[in-house]
Amino acid sequence: MIRLTVLYNLKPEVDEAEFLEWRLTDHQKANSSMPGVVHTDFSLNTLAWPKDTQPRYRFMTTAEWPNMKLFEEAFYEPNFQIELKNGVEKMLEDYTFLIGEILADHNEIT
């Protein structure tokens, strides 16, 4: 399983309420409909460690694909890369994109 993790902050001129409205509707649908995506989520980071420190990144998005081939086909598709670059340049200022292979996983239904 391949996981894309994007940690980011918005540019000061980006209205957070408007961003969240878009991010939780149109953009969430776009993320979940990317070819091969089996899971995606979006979070607001409110706590960090050590205790009483502020999170470096306000937002985090993850998306998962079953294998590297499907990830690369979707993520590195030229039109998607253009859209991604434009979106990042327009809205984000401090960001990190991490691509990792999941080596261990545990899910518990409570």
Residue ranges: model-predicted function:
Residues 1-110:
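Macromolecular interaction modules
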